[in-house]
Amino acid sequence: MKHYVVDEPEGMDGFLYDTRNELTNYTYYYQFDPYRETQLEADQVPAIKTFSRSIVKWLEEHGTEENRVIQQYGLSFQKIRHFADELGHVCDAAMEHGYGLSVLGD
């Protein structure tokens, strides 16, 4: 099987944490430890997929806040959208094959 990888851009962790109350299933994503390898079972992958979609929804609903987000986190909406889309794509592949997700920390 092809390897699917998503890189979390610098500043994304702060953005996601600060918007966590407006995102669906942030608590599942928060389980990923940025400093060590973390595994999520296959039954948790749909929750991460929903989380990725909630990021896209947040962007669509807060289009006027892009300058603030760029200033505060150094992230354009395009970069955030790319991350969310790639995360969703990895989730789709994992769900299609019944796999969980692995995260490799720094």
Residue map of PLM features:
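Acidic (Asp/Glu-rich) sequence patches and key acidic residues
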Residues: 1-106
